Amino acid sequence: LIEEETGKWYNLNENPIEIKINWNETTNTTVENELKKSQIKIIKVDKENHEVKLKDVELEVLDKDGNVLEKLKTDKNGECYTKRYAIRDYPELYIRETKTNEKYVLDTEMKKITLKENEIVNYTFENQKIYGQIKVIKTSEEDNKINGDKKGTPIPNVSFGVYDENKNFIEKITTGADGIAITSKLEKGTKYIKELEGESGEWYQLNENEYSAEIVKHGEIVELNITNKPDNPNIDVEKDGIIQTTANQEIKYDFTIGNIGNVPLNNFTWYDYLPTEYVTATKLVTGTYNQDIDYAIYYKTNKNDYRLLRDNL
């Protein structure tokens, strides 16, 4: 017995069936036909790089009425298989993602997949990795006495290093005229921002603090408001000596000069006003300095312009 044609939803039974017929007897033979079936192979990948497979993504398989037929989870290769479904009963199925990798955006779109007779239907799902940016707003912490910037003024040309959660360098960003610097697209997670030495902006102090920012949602821009203290050059001069004297007596004054500002001083000038009708300067002593650098000392009186007293001290 050879089957030549069968029902629409069934596979033809191509196996010849041997039937033994006995005289004056009716022989009954059962011939089975399998329903035409199909299943789906799901592959979860990174949207930008299909070589990256996503494991432990959870999905549901539903019928056209929204009934959940089974639940799936991708393996280490980002793959999972549905059961085999009869085409007669389920000509199409729907796939819904319920949980994805924490670094990726959940795909909420319901996928409609048409089954094919006696085939495994391959379906690739893409997931968008979560990206965000960090926006640094750099302003003056106080009024700047050197350049006249008021408190809150944007500071240009300040550079920052951007680092990942393991403190690995990612990129360098620099503020524009508006005091704003913004990173490129960064993956979800905690990032660190630190001002780069020597690039804190003209007339401003380096901010040595490390700042953190966490990117949680796709497309978000996390703002960091960071301030810098202005450079504040300043010196303190103490004058010690006798208060009263008699005519023609030599008097001596000692000056203690200290840097009380927040920047090194390349040069500075101090003044001492004496009554010229009563006093004549006779000697200037260079003094003692506590930094091992070269010094040049100039002096000026009411009788002459600046003159070099000592060089290369």
How would you describe each model-predicted region?
Residues 1-313:
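Solvent-exposed loop/turn and edge beta-strand elements of beta-rich ligand-binding domains
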